[in-house]
Amino acid sequence: MISRVLYRPFDESDFEPCTQIVQDAWHKDSGNEVYNFFEAAADFSYCLSVSTFSQVAVVDGRVCGIVLARTGKRNMKTSDHWAQVEHDIIQQMQQIEPELTDRYLTFIKTQVRINNWLIEQCPQTPPDEITLLAVSSSTRGLGVGSVLLDAACSHVTNQGGTSAYLFTDTDCSYKFYEHRGFKRAAARKANLNERFCSLPRESFLYTLDLNA
């Protein structure tokens, strides 16, 4: 049976299914599933707060993928809304699992530092970023991820951009981006302290020439 796939902008009603996709991909280490969901929700809320473009994939009526990108100026009302959502979720995380929340915040702080280091290694880093690409495991192989990524790149081009970048790592399917034409511009291996904070073995910055 051929699946029916619809692509459209993100709606707030998509928040829970998109968070579930993010959780299944990157937030399942804790034995507390409620905490895992909150952690994924905080991560996803942050991505929404820094993004200006969204596209979700709906397969047979079910949200199965999302891409976010950042180009130009953000709508500060929308950005502030999602930043507040992230803040509120982290407060809930601290109430149910304070130690895990502290560990998560340390992870985020360390990841930001590593990302900033990667950017420093690439003085010509483009201003436009693919901030998130996540697809449900149940629909991988249908080409959903490729269509979503192409939509984000087309948006960057339509906004006048000529290249884009993204962060990825060894905990992600980074080879996918290479197959889509992205080039590795910088890499950094995690040290022992960073690995203790659950950082991936190696982090990367990839860029894509949209004129190629």
Where are these regions (language model features)?
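Conserved GNAT acetyl-CoA-binding A-motif
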Residues: 127-128, 156-169
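Conserved active-site alpha-helix within GNAT-family acetyltransferase domains
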Residues: 116, 146, 170-187
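Helix-loop element at the rim of GNAT/NAT acetyltransferase active sites that forms part
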Residues: 20-36, 45-46, 71-76
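Conserved beta-strand-loop-alpha-helix junction that forms the acyl-donor binding cleft
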Residues: 131-140, 165-175, 191-194
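A short beta-loop-alpha structural element at the N-terminal edge
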Residues: 4-20, 71-72
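Conserved acetyl-CoA-binding loop-helix of GNAT-fold acetyltransferases
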Residues: 135, 141-154, 179
